[in-house]
């Protein structure tokens, strides 16, 4: 039996996939029980000016008279942790990645989700959470507000105005939970962002 609680706010953040793959190959029999058995990731497009202002647009506000606006583009590629209320949802949440820990062979995973907005608004980004299946009928999730994990927020570099019934197509990639990429289309507006672009490049 393998029991692990290396769960980050977006499920894979603490490298649970590579850890389980390694432990399963070296330490477990073929019929071993793994807890959690699976981890699914859900996304939802959100209109949440509060978290966007605190996390991204703050860099455009010239704090203490300093122009830090060039850093806003880096902030827009960070996967932030924070609570997002359901009142900000612009569509119904959808499953984007499903990982079966009993069979998964790589820690690099990807998936796709499609949404249709249920109301108009300003789409600031996407909120996400995990759902871990521990056993039949027993799940652990940070979907509901109030957990210590909170949620994750994947911002857009530029918020997009949407009308009701706007189609949204999102692809999500995770490289062992260490780097993330979210890309797709909001109506006809493309976006492509990744956490690897969240830090200024350095030159030696």
Predicted regions, residues:
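Class I SAM-binding transferase module
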Residues: 1-204
